[in-house]
Amino acid sequence: MPRQSISKESPTMTTPMMQQYKSIKSQAPDAILFFRLGDFYEMFGEDARTAAPILEIALTGRDSGGGERIPMCGVPHHAVDGYLLKLVSAGYKVALCEQVEDPQAAKGIVKREIIRIISPGTLTDSLVEQANNFLAAVYHEQDWGLAFVDVSTGEFTVFQTESLDILTTELSRIRPSELLLPAELLKAKHWRPYYLTQREKKTYQHTLLEERFTEQRELFQEFPTAMKAANGLWQYILETSPGIDPSHILKVNAYRPEHWMLLDPWTRRNLELTESIRGQGKKGTLLSVLDFTKTAFGGRLLRRWIEQPLLLKGEIEKRLDYVEALVEDSFLRGDLIQLFGKVYDLERLMGKVSYGTANARDLLSLAQTLGVLPQLRALLAEGKSEPLQAFIPALEGLDPLAATLEQAINPEAPISLKDGNLLKAGYSVEIDELRSISSGGKAWVAKLESMEKDRTGIRSLKVGYNKVFGYYIEVTHANSHLIPAEYIRKQTLANAERFITPELKEYEQKILGAEEKVTQLEYQLFLELRETVRGQAAKILEAAHALAEIDVYTSLAEAAVRHHYSRPVMKGEGGLTIIEGRHPVVESMLQDTSFVPNDTILTEDKHLALITGPNMAGKSTYMRQVALIVLMAQIGSFVPAQQATIPIADHIFTRVGASDDLASGQSTFMVEMYEVAHILRHVTPQSLIILDEVGRGTATYDGLSIAWAVAEYLAGQENKPKTLFATHYHELTDLEETHSGIFNLHVGVREHGEEIVFLHKIIPGRADRSYGIQVAKLAGLPANLLHRAKIILHELESSAKESRQEHLFNKEKATQLSLFEVQPLDPLLQEVSELSVEDLTPRQALDYLFDLKERIKAADSL
């Protein structure tokens, strides 16, 4: 849940300004109020106590009336974005209260209003460029409804499902910065990872969204629960931005599961698609290998594609056509990469325009980006690629707006809109005339000073200006006898007197009036320009989406060329064939060695591969590479293989490694079993499953039993999902003899005496050894320990051979029951294995050894 700022201000608050503050604070009691006073945003009372240490600013005080002081702190208005981000990141909402009238024109207290409430989900500035910042809402009736929006870009999506499991999977993909929930859903454990905001149920019943998007009414009928979530989301957007029309939100998109692969959080994590499990951010992920995007919105789109592979063959082929066109046209690809380096974030610029926060520099960035479009259209038209020419219409129609902005905005414009100097000379005749008067003032003052020196004979006479007295004539006391009678004394200094004249006062009013008028007129004309841009939001965002796609296709083509990828052959169903496949991430990180490629063939007849071999030999890398190659193909990317034929997978499931989930109170084994259960519940004939060491989180026989049963279950399914199953339980390799769909693979190892070399090559057949001691040696375990391990291993292997049944399987019944006919451990061995040595005194240990020796002798004599 979000932290809350609870108002505990002094009960007096008798000054008019503090009364105004108290009234406005009551409108946002759960937010820290940034109260605009001149050039600062001030915080008072409990808000100040809370904010000061987080913002690392001084906590002071202010008279609140009745002789009492109230805690206070403040931040400069021009640097507010950074301070907002700090508070929001710390879990607080911030209400931004502005002066909404000119202080000079105000009668009494300046009118102030809350113009925005900033929370994690409504933050629009200081965001990660290549990541979305989603605000989400959930609603539940018979189905579950989810709506999410990035208010900084305008992307708005709804999703409806019968399954809470699928809903939480989708939530884990979008990772909302803030989640809106009705009160009855708040306490459920599913929402723990998110910043929660409680909403009244009635806010989900508003019809403002339907009234706004009348042309999309079919969505309200097709996805009624999801659209109620969207209603609640829209109401929150309007409440947190009063008076703002979010015109950059142009439509509501429906997420349809039949169009995109739903990746569960374990698969996204295990495959390290966009985030590294080693906590290094993007480094070491699939995204890091494929991302050659140059634009922020292209980077966000690529991330979305990686997390949402396609299921429709036609859409996949269309993407592959675009990528292939850019692979083949290296000149076009290079020119596009260079051109995209000049493109700013159109989506977020339009978000700022929509929210009324875009300044002159933002419009200049917009103009520069729109100015690139003619060159881009020419490149696409002249290039060899007919598919890419389909983007040209989306890039047309904005040249006049680009020209207007280019002619209007001053490249040296300040950040503040109230400081003037926003517009270029020549854009407005009236502004040019007023500027002429203002700039001509310096020449007029110099001329007046020269004339007065000549007229009075006072050579030290000066004409100057300050903000308190305006223009003045300064004469030293030594020349006081030469002062003309018409001079009017204004100020006495230690060594001089300052005077004004009617002529000087008249010109002062003319100059200062011109400067004030220029500032006001520039501000008004800038607002008109911004409204003109807002009016073109649909066209600008259409161009932005086209640019994002082209940037992503260019990025995928660049990755394909640099890493020597090939175009996959896509099939609706059937067998999976990968010739000389490589792991895209591992390959990219190798410095001095080349990656060893491997083949993969999974058919409907042979669909489950049991993979054995030692640790560090490459089993996990091999399995992950197969999953990544399939995923890459389904986002429309070329793949790291000499050749690949890919049947479209509706799911990619992975069970790779596990650790305790302390927050949920679940052990490693429980987490592992939950993941396996999830896979078995959702698997289909089109699924690809990666299972690594199922059952190792518990006792040996328990783990072996579960791994065995899971393999049999998948092999016996009518749907026959394609499965790669790595295991250290060598007993499982016998399943090849009784289940036609199962076959064995192992990782090649070359032995040189006591040394081993991992070949990283996947070979048909089973591994006969695990080479655990050799791996331990490579890891640097002490030599005496390794020697002892060899002795124990030899004894255990000998014991196992003697106790093992002559036949593990009953061929006629073809059942796995004989697995459990393995003789149990000898009682003495069992007793020793369970002995708590550390709890024995030296004398007790010695006595126990003598006793054990006598019992063994007695047993041998039987």
From Swiss-Prot:
Pfam families to which the protein is assigned, alphabetical: MutS_I, MutS_II, MutS_III, MutS_IV, MutS_V
SUPFAM superfamilies on file: DNA repair protein MutS, domain I (SSF55271), DNA repair protein MutS, domain II (SSF53150), DNA repair protein MutS, domain III (SSF48334), P-loop containing nucleoside triphosphate hydrolases (SSF52540)
Entry keyword set = ATP-binding, DNA damage, DNA repair, DNA-binding, Nucleotide-binding
Gene3D superfamilies, A to Z: 1.10.1420.10, DNA repair protein MutS, domain I, MutS, connector domain, P-loop containing nucleotide triphosphate hydrolases
- Residues engaged in binding ATP: 613-620
Q: Which SMART domains match?
A: MUTSac, MUTSd
Which is one Gene Ontology cellular component term of this protein?
cytosol
Q: What does this protein do?
A: This protein is involved in the repair of mismatches in DNA. It is possible that it carries out the mismatch recognition step. This protein has a weak ATPase activity.
Cite the NCBIfam families for this sequence: mutS1 (TIGR01070), PRK05399.1 (NF003810)
Q: Which HAMAP family match?
A: MutS (MF_00096)
Q: What is this protein called?
A: DNA mismatch repair protein MutS
Organism of derivation: Desulfitobacterium hafniense (strain Y51)
